[in-house]
UniProtKB/Swiss-Prot annotation:
GO terms for biological process: translation. This is Small ribosomal subunit protein uS17. Part of the 30S ribosomal subunit. Keywords: Ribonucleoprotein, Ribosomal protein, RNA-binding, rRNA-binding. One of the primary rRNA binding proteins, it binds specifically to the 5'-end of 16S ribosomal RNA. Belongs to the universal ribosomal protein uS17 family. The keyword RNA-binding applies. The keyword Manganese does not apply. Pfam families: Ribosomal_S17 (PF00366). One of its GO terms (cellular component) is cytosolic small ribosomal subunit. SUPFAM superfamilies: Nucleic acid-binding proteins. GO terms for molecular function: rRNA binding; structural constituent of ribosome.
Amino acid sequence: MSQRNQRKVYVGRVVSDKMDKTITVLVETYKKHPLYGKRVKYSKKYKAHDEHNIAKVGDIVKIMETRPLSATKRFRLVEVIEKAVVL
């Protein structure tokens, strides 16, 4: 059996679940400034495939890179790490 190649795995917060079987995940990370060396926080949104519509807005989720599923979707939901607190 061949082993699957290394894939990008990100942890982020769901900011939108309005689409069917698709969630938008905000991933925040730090990047070092090339000249000054200060860590700068930046964020990026990824669309991810959620087959069973499990994730809701505010959930912390893990997403993994996969083959292109649409024009903008290149990730799929692996697991919901933490459910959002509903007040």
